[in-house]
A protein has these predicted regions:
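Active-site-adjacent structural elements in enzyme catalytic domains
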Residues: 147
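Parallel beta-helix/beta-solenoid
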Residues: 150-157
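Short N-terminal segments immediately surrounding and downstream of signal-peptide cleavage
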Residues: 22-41
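Bacterial N-terminal signal peptides
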Residues: 7-16
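Primarily the internal scaffold of c-type cytochrome electron-transfer domains
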Residues: 23-24, 47-62, 76-144, 157-317
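Boundary at the C-terminal end of the N-terminal hydrophobic targeting segment
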Residues: 17-21
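Positively charged n-region of N-terminal signal peptides that target proteins for export
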Residues: 1-5
Length: 317
């Protein structure tokens, strides 16, 4: 019995030292401001409350106010029980804790997805869609409902804040990956990290990417699931340890790759990246494929200085 107790204490001490060695794990406690939010919203929004309660944010005591706080004068800020908050959590907000990830994302084509809305491609699509029967205060001339609930949900919308401070329903809710936010930032972290659980397992799942990478003009999801990679994933997905904080192919799993495995996730030789272009050696979107550094140069992105050979090596490694 004494030996069991000693071993247990040693295990606890070892775990404690391990946590301490990893550095800060979050806030010491839920803030008073967030506690005030939770007091009401645990009953008003029980689903959101439960999702947050199962998240790593919960374990780090990062709650409502830490993400939704705003300041008087910001475009989408409104006063709520004496505090200024915003409904939209933009990459600028996430950068308070996740600066490296946001910087990488901002350098990627993902974050620029909303720029297509002003392009000739998009104008052509709007003409083809035709019906502009979805009229809102921000768009009295109307929009095609198929664009609002289709194209914009992947590429992102340009969020419009109405005169009364509310968000135009044609542009919000929206989690498009290239959303243009009221604070001027581009992108939406929740395109991949679905609120409010922000599950790593969910973000790594092929269906997460397949929400947008599917269909006749970008059929990556269909190609993946019909490939040996997709067949293996379907057979062994319960054995891939997709919820682990550390998720390195060849160490934590080996039976099948997901989209994230090759394009984003950590390997034995390189860290996670949120710039998906750093492992792609061709840009196949144009009618004639181009090297990614060419496309990056046109968009003014840092990747213009990263040759395709380096990106190919990143993918191989």
């Amino acid at each position: 019995m004494k030996q069991t107790v000693i071993l247990t204490l040693l295990a606890v001490a070892s775990a404690t030292l391990s946590v301490q060695a990893q550095g800060p794990q979050g806030l010491a406690a839920v803030s008073e401001d967030s506690a005030a939010c939770l007091k009401c919203h645990k009953d008003l929004d029980p689903g959101i409350y439960q999702q947050w309660g199962e998240s790593r944010h919960f374990r780090a005591n990062v709650a409502c106010y830490e993400c939704h706080r705003s300041a008087k004068g910001e475009p989408d800020a409104f006063e709520h029980f004496g505090k200024f908050i915003a409904t939209i959590v933009s990459p600028k907000d996430c950068a308070a804790c996740h600066k490296r990830e946001v910087d990488e994302f901002a350098s990627s084509h993902h974050s620029k997805g909303g720029r297509i809305l002003g392009s000739l491609d998009n104008r052509l699509a709007e003409v083809v869609e035709g019906n502009k029967g979805f009229k809102t205060e921000g768009f009295p001339e109307g929009n095609a409902a198929s664009a609002v609930s289709g194209c914009w949900q992947c590429h992102g919308s340009v969020i419009k804040v109405l005169d009364d401070g509310k968000l135009d329903p044609a542009t919000w809710p929206n989690t498009g990956i290239g959303r243009i936010n009221p604070d001027g930032s581009e992108g939406s972290c929740s395109a991949c990290h679905v609120r409010h659980s922000f599950s790593a397992e969910q973000a790594r799942h092929p269906d997460n990417c397949g929400k947008c990478h599917m269909g006749p003009d970008h059929p990556q999801k269909e190609i993946y699931y019909e490939s040996k990679h997709g067949i293996a994933f379907s057979a062994y997905k319960d054995k891939l340890n997709m919820g682990r904080p550390k998720w390195v192919v060849g160490e934590d799993y080996f039976l099948a790759p997901t989209c994230a495995t090759c394009h984003m996730s950590a390997t034995k030789d390189q860290p996670v990246t949120h710039d998906i272009g750093m492992r792609i050696s061709w840009n196949n979107r144009p009618a004639i494929s181009v090297r990614p550094e060419v496309a990056d140069a046109k968009m003014g992105l840092p990747g213009k200085d990263v040759p395709w050979q380096q990106r190919r090596d990143n993918m191989i490694n």
